[in-house]
Amino acid sequence: METILGFTAIAVALLIGMGALGTAIGFGLLGGKFLEGAARQPEMAPMLQVKMFIVAGLLDAVTMIGVGIALYMLFTNPLGAML
């Protein structure tokens, strides 16, 4: 029983940690490409900014879904009932 709970805690930590790492890398790439595009064509900066914020919101949504799944795994462990 303790090993299942331990492995669940490790899985939750990896899920949240890797989600945060992926989001950080994604935001870095997104911001860099936005600045590159705005520097090349300054007249397109407002349109690019709107698209950047939409993609940033989607990037955050994916991470929040991962956090929700991790918390579900943490508090309602379905494998614990099988023992």
Swiss-Prot record:
It is a multi-pass membrane protein. F-type ATPases have 2 components, F(1) - the catalytic core - and F(0) - the membrane proton channel. F(1) has five subunits: alpha(3), beta(3), gamma(1), delta(1), epsilon(1). F(0) has three main subunits: a(1), b(2) and c(10-14). The alpha and beta chains form an alternating ring which encloses part of the gamma chain. F(1) is attached to F(0) by a central stalk formed by the gamma and epsilon chains, while a peripheral stalk is formed by the delta and b chains. The gene is atpE. This is ATP synthase subunit c. F(1)F(0) ATP synthase produces ATP from ADP in the presence of a proton or sodium gradient. F-type ATPases consist of two structural domains, F(1) containing the extramembraneous catalytic core and F(0) containing the membrane proton channel, linked together by a central stalk and a peripheral stalk. During catalysis, ATP synthesis in the catalytic domain of F(1) is coupled via a rotary mechanism of the central stalk subunits to proton translocation. InterPro entries: ATP_synth_csu_bac/chlpt, ATP_synth_F0_csu, ATP_synth_F0_csu_DDCD_BS, ATP_synth_F0_csu_sf, ATPase_proteolipid_c-like_dom, F/V-ATP_Csub_sf. The record marks 60 as: Reversibly protonated during proton transport. It comes from Shewanella amazonensis (strain ATCC BAA-1098 / SB2B). Keywords: ATP synthesis, Cell inner membrane, Cell membrane, CF(0), Hydrogen ion transport, Ion transport, Lipid-binding, Membrane, Transmembrane, Transmembrane helix, Transport. The chain crosses the membrane at residues 10-30, 52-72. One of its GO terms (cellular component) is proton-transporting two-sector ATPase complex, proton-transporting domain. Gene3D superfamilies: F1F0 ATP synthase subunit C. GO terms for molecular function: lipid binding; proton-transporting ATP synthase activity, rotational mechanism. It is found in: Cell inner membrane. Its main location: membrane. Belongs to the ATPase C chain family.
